[in-house]
């Protein structure tokens, strides 16, 4: 094939209540559409994870959020793999029955999907996850024992694991208003912000693929829940999608290494993100290098930070359908503006020539 292949990046930040991507796997249809018009799509677990539901896409790189920022900064490159040996990291706070449920998911993934889940470890202390919510509505969280988390991760890596699936015990509060709103398709995922903190710690320390699945007791049956949150009502764990994603997640390598067929930071051609969430470090790095940023207005969030507030140049698009069309035109070698009505006149850099022409 002649010409450059199209590498797209899709970012939907977690914990800010995005209209698309703020729930359990509800950004997967968007990822599938973008992947279909791209040669390669790079995205993160919040986009691809749907609890018990997932959709393997051969041209999608599953990259943890902190790693994505380091990649955008030019510090890391991505090394595609055939498969990863996955290690299971379980919080000591998980009750025995709930731990067995997660163990069964890992064993089922080996038996039915052929994944390589090679070792498991229980932390030497309860991790102590605490959930928080900012005044804006965005969620975040902390863990009391990051040292225990990192020691357990180190054990798995020394045992030959190449990617880590973390299962931390999250607080149960089925009566919480925030949780009830989320189940009804309103508000913000109360778990999302804390999940990101856990995976960031491991990736920052060890530079390996990592994703998180919270351990919770099953919620009471509610026939009125929103379809957008329904994926989290299935089964006993959120682990299946994490194992599927990590199984072929690219490994993280220093950008200074010489690696054949790696995905280099300069490979990125275009970035798609919610219009109110383009202030993250990754997007700012890409924008500074002149990479087109497609800011989608319909993907609202709890944030109210516009591109103009940050001085970030973007392509303002109303819908994700418009973004998919923009990508298709761009891949075909067209100026996407050529598909809209109106005159596009040539602009002279020499001001006097411009005046003479217009006069």
UniProtKB/Swiss-Prot annotation:
The main place the protein resides is: membrane
Lipid moiety-binding region for S-diacylglycerol cysteine? 18
Q: How does it sit in the membrane?
A: Lipid-anchor
Leader sequence range is: 1-17
Q: Which organism is it from?
A: Synechococcus sp. (strain ATCC 27144 / PCC 6301 / SAUG 1402/1)
What is the name attached to this protein's record? Uncharacterized lipoprotein syc1174_c
Q: Where is the lipid attached (N-palmitoyl cysteine)?
A: 18
Q: Where's it found, cell-wise?
A: Cell membrane
Does the record's keyword annotation contain Transferase? Answer: no
Q: Name one GO cellular component term.
A: plasma membrane
Keywords, in A-Z order: Cell membrane, Lipoprotein, Membrane, Palmitate, Signal
Coiled coil start-end: none
């Amino acid at each position: 094939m002649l010409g450059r292949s199209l590498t797209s990046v899709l970012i939907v930040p977690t914990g800010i209540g995005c209209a698309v991507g703020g729930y359990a796997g509800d950004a997967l249809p968007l990822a599938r559409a973008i992947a279909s018009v791209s040669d390669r799509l790079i995205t993160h677990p919040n986009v691809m994870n749907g609890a018990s539901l997932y959709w393997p896409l051969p041209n999608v790189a599953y990259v943890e959020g902190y790693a994505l920022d380091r990649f955008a900064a030019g510090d890391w490159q991505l090394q595609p793999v055939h498969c990863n040996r996955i290690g299971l990291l379980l919080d000591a706070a998980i009750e025995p029955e709930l731990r067995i449920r997660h163990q069964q998911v890992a064993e089922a993934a080996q038996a039915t999907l052929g994944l390589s889940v090679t070792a498991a470890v229980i932390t030497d202390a309860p991790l102590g996850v605490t959930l928080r919510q900012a005044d804006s509505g965005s969620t975040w969280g902390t863990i009391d024992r990051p040292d225990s988390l990192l020691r357990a991760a180190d054990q798995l890596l020394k045992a030959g694991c190449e990617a880590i699936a973390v299962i931390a015990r999250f607080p149960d509060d089925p009566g919480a208003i925030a949780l009830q709103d989320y189940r009804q398709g309103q508000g913000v995922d109360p778990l999302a912000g804390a999940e990101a903190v856990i995976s960031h710690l491991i990736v920052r320390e060890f530079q390996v693929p990592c994703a998180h699945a919270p351990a919770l007791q099953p919620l009471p049956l509610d026939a009125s829940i929103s379809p957008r949150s329904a994926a989290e009502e299935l089964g006993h764990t959120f682990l299946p999608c994490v194992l599927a994603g990590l199984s072929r997640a690219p490994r993280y390598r220093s950008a200074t290494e010489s690696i054949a067929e790696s995905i280099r930071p300069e490979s990125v051609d275009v970035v798609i993100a919610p219009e109110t969430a383009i202030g993250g470090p990754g997007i700012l790095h890409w924008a500074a290098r002149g990479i087109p940023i497609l800011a989608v207005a319909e993907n609202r969030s709890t944030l109210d930070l516009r591109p103009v507030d940050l001085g970030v140049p973007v392509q303002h698009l109303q819908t994700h359908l418009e973004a998919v069309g923009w990508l298709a035109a761009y891949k075909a070698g067209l100026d996407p503006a050529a598909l809209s009505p109106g005159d596009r006149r040539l602009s002279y850099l020499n001001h006097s020539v411009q005046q003479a022409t217009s006069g």
